Amino acid sequence: MKIAITGSSSGIGLAVKNLLEAEHEMVCLDITDGYTIDDLSIIKHILDADIFINNAFSKTKPEAQQLLFDTVYGEWKHTEKQIINVGSLSKYYDPKDTVTFPRYTNAKKALNEAHCAALVQKDRTVRMTQICPGYTDTAMVDGWDVPKLEVEVIASAIHYCIKMAAAGIEISDYTICKARG
């Protein structure tokens, strides 16, 4: 299968790329290669794929990840392709608790709302998953004293969701976090 992924040069995206590239043709769309999710022209590189992993977050245009999802969903709604959004456990946070990364948290909440609105559309055939990791060992939370997931755990969860979709099983929401204690 052909898989398009945003944000594949570091963190979760790099772990996903490393895990899947032996089995799949990867289309890696990353800012280090001149591809930014702020520019919807990258869509032409995504639509030819079978699976889209919507992983990257834009600090300059926080709504970009949701806009990219909306665009791909609109094109793929009646296909048997798969969209995997990398959301965040922060979708559950109370708005007053978003002081550290308010733009990030609000963008992930908006992505979650768009995902949920699309899920309930009865005429869709595209398979959709939203992976919502808790704190993950990435540059974003470097130095924080919190239990963190390894990026490879998230990559394995994404791989599992791809396998399940291929078997006709849709995992619509997959929340994962490090156990405390």
What residue ranges belong to the model's regions?
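Catalytic loop of short-chain dehydrogenase/reductase
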Residues: 58-61, 73-123, 132-135
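Adenosine-cofactor binding site in Rossmann-like domains, unifying the SAM/SAH pocket
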Residues: 25-44, 58-67
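A short, aliphatic-rich alpha-helical micro-motif
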Residues: 46-47, 104
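Rossmann-fold scaffold of SDR-type NAD(P)-dependent oxidoreductases
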Residues: 6-7, 49-58, 65, 82-87, ...
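A generic structural motif
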Residues: 22-27, 125-126
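N-terminal Rossmann NAD(P)H-binding glycine-rich loop of SDR-like oxidoreductase domains
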Residues: 4-22
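Short-chain dehydrogenase/reductase
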Residues: 6, 66, 100-113, 147-152
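C-terminal helical subdomain
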Residues: 130-131, 143-181
